[in-house]
Amino acid sequence: MLKVQNPGITGAFLFFGEIIMKIITWNVNGLRACMEKGWKEFFLQADADLFGIQETKLQPDQISLDLPGYHIYYNSAEKKGYSGTAVFAKKEPESVRYGIGIDQHDHEGRVITLEYPDFYYVNCYTPNAQNELKRLAYRMQWENDFRQYLKSLNMAKPVILSGDLNVAHEEIDLKNPKENRNNAGFSDEEREKMTELLRSGFTDVYRFLYPEKTDAYTWWSYRFRARERNAGWRIDYFIISDDLKSSVSDCTILSDVTGSDHCPVMLEIF
């Protein structure tokens, strides 16, 4: 069981006598733009204990957020207006790491790790392989190094990973698998790297709970009325250490929440 050290966490609630911790992940596709579409209202209503976002596309001095009760951590890309992650945490962590400790990967603001007494929370924005798989070779190196990073954390304590991992793992995870075979996000190579991760002591929470659920997507192209037609991809995940599977209460895709081309995903765990 995942032990929540502070029973007074605001927003955590009792579930058959256990404290439920709520974690949300959302690729906001530009935090400032998303704020104009209701991000803060959703954030306050969600009342999550941990809230990880990806593609912030800003430097911390470009935004001022008044979020009482939250500690805020940014990891911004050196290239302005690109990539970036942030975590909003009700409980101050024991430590915070930015990046994965490998220089070639740590200039784009892709990973933030918060350490708590009983687990690590990792917020990640995985590099896109890009059109014609131009960045696939780099993506493969990233996958290998990031997997080793997660495995090293997992040796110390359980891991909760969330974020836009930029891959639809199986055919059930996107609307049009045949048409997208070997496109970025659905190449054989990227899918195999996800398989390798899940064979390394980790679990895709949504598929663990809902192995046969179809039409469950987290990203839709802005083109061709894709969201209206639900022609999407499931590329935003919660991945947890296998040891935490028995602690999961639910994992929910909040597809009705707009403001980005992605929607939030919520994990409830005790």
List each language-model region with its residue ranges.
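Active-site beta-strand termini and strand-to-loop segments that position acidic
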Residues: K90, L114-P117, S241-D242, L267-F270
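Conserved beta strand-loop-helix elements of the APE1-like EEP
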Residues: K80-S95, R223-S246
